[in-house]
Amino acid sequence: MKRFLIAAILTVALPLGTAAAREAPSTSSGHTAILAPLALAQRDQQNLAAARPDARNLYDLTRRLKLHSLAAINPYVRASAPNYAVGRVDTFWVAQATSGYFSLKAKLLLKTPHAYWYVQENMGIPRARLLAALRISAHVFETHVYPTDHAAFGREWTPGVDHDPRITVLCANLPGVGGYYSAEDLYPRSVNPFSNQRKMLYVNITAFALGTPDFDSTIAHELQHMIHWYQHERDDTWINEGSSVLAQVLTGYTPDGQDQAFAADPGTQLDDFCYGAPECSENAAYAHYGAGFLWMYYLYQQYGGDRAMRAVLADGSLSGIALFDDVLARLGSRDRARDAFRKWVIANLVDAPGLDSGAYGYRPTYQGCCVHAAVTASSSSYPFTRHARVNQFATNYVALKPGGTSTLHLQFRGDPTVRIVPNTPLQGGMEWWSNRGDEMDSTLTRALDLSHVRRATLQYDIWYAVEKDFDYGYVEVSTDGGRTWYAAPGRYTTNADPNGANYGHGYTGISVKKAGNHNGWLHESIDLSPYAGRRILVRFEHITDDAFNLSGLTLDNIRVPEIGFADGPGTSGWQMHGWVRVANLLPTHWLVQLVLYTRQGVQVRQMPLSASADGQATLTGLGHDVQRVVVAISPTAPQTTIPSSYTLTVR
């Protein structure tokens, strides 16, 4: 999907020791049934950390899957800059908010050192007023937005696919969106038929009028996306969108209330994003924008300003939460991602920049800054028990108020593990997972010898949650040693291609919505008889676009009965780039923090937890020196969007 823009004496007794998790002893047999869930989760975590999916390379994908050619694709559509003249009219492809494209004509009304300014024809705006407003925004862009975004994030690809250093800004009626940037425009039409073959930013001037701060803020937002694509193509959407809202603030504008949307819903998962999906409301989308922004804003203020942002974009090999471990190390900080997240959780609650050398607050730099996260639940009556679920890298804030006793005993128990994807492996407790991410290309490849059979079928069970019409999974065959591939049709694949992203026959959408599924699993059979009598390569491939992704694909029971092949519990014979053999478990890694509001100020304490996610604390002085206590509860399992459950008991 395109990157669309929507609008005193207090004592805290904490146990110092932690109990070791009990695990069944392992053996060298490789059978997973003898391992306790936590041990399986730890193994999955290690394997996932080692798995590095490739970045999506549209030239390579087009060559080997669409053109079936060994010839390289020229990334340029012209040899020199076109230097377009004011007054020309061009036809542009424009993405619709849900899926598909339409075309429109627009006239070039203004040319500045770094941009062409096109306006859709027949907008009904008097020419003199249109030009005056256009010149205002063009001046702001050249003198403020462009240099500010460059200082913080770097530069875009220049001269680009058309050898033109200028960016095209299309001002038009874009139903359902405020503006967007599409990386597909930076490729020739042989790669994507809907490419405009130039660097482009799109702004809906029926929503954000030319010559206004709203328009200029949108340009700052979308320009960051263009820069981000060139500097760190494979970054996750939540980081990219957070950076774009930060770009708005750095150029003097506001985050459009998205910070407050997150503050109202701090249970929003930081390392996830949603927009456009039926289950994603506008408020939920705004909260995701706000989470990403506040994280990037916090990093910007705490760890080095522009230098910190440059470090984020310079690390092209990593994305997600893992990226920030590396970034903070390279910035010379002792903190790592979970340290920064722990402090950020408290900053969002108390916003006290004078506390702990500024670690628990924001320095206000925009109108309306900053936030005080909403309390999720509260009690002044004890005993009190809360059973709840909370998203990964999100927080429940539970307030404990005075109520009949000054001493409280807290006991926490959380799920020690969480699933990676919302399914259950069918056989042996293990399944193949494609991994997940934006701009991702993960492959699972194996050689098959069909030279002694006249017919063959590739059978497997598949479960998938893939962004419909934008991301796809494939089963492919190669007869030339992997130089070119053919995406084979299956019972549940489609060759429909509304967005130029389907390389043949692909799985897209959600398998649980398909007729005949069993708990989301579908049994698939691919006819390999056309390749009988030959040695071939078979590949499972998952390709995602530059914005938004779901859980991915999982496979089980892979077999070719005619040659006696049945996939075992290990990985022997497979070439894996991004795919991982998993038990579908990760350690949860809970953070439980106690925020004490005392007469002397705010104090923050950590509750130590055992490996099995149990912990306890005793609080004294409530209602005397302590006005109230807030327990901040956050699970931090990466790469999953499944919530974790916990129980907090207070006596």
What is each stretch, according to the model?
Residues R22-G154, T158:
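N-terminal module-boundary/linker segments of secreted carbohydrate-active enzymes
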Residues A456-Y464, I536-I543, V631:
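Extracellular beta-strand-rich recognition modules
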Residues A7-P15:
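Bacterial N-terminal signal peptides
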Residues R22-S29, A36, L318-T443, D461, ...:
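Beta/coil-rich, acidic/histidine-enriched accessory regions frequently appended to metallopeptidases
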Residues E476-R535, A566, T571-L591, T598-G615:
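Exoplasmic/lumenal beta-rich domain surfaces
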Residues L528-F548:
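Extracellular beta-strand ligand-recognition surfaces/modules
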Residues K111-T237, S243, T251-D272:
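Juxtacatalytic substrate-recognition/specificity segment
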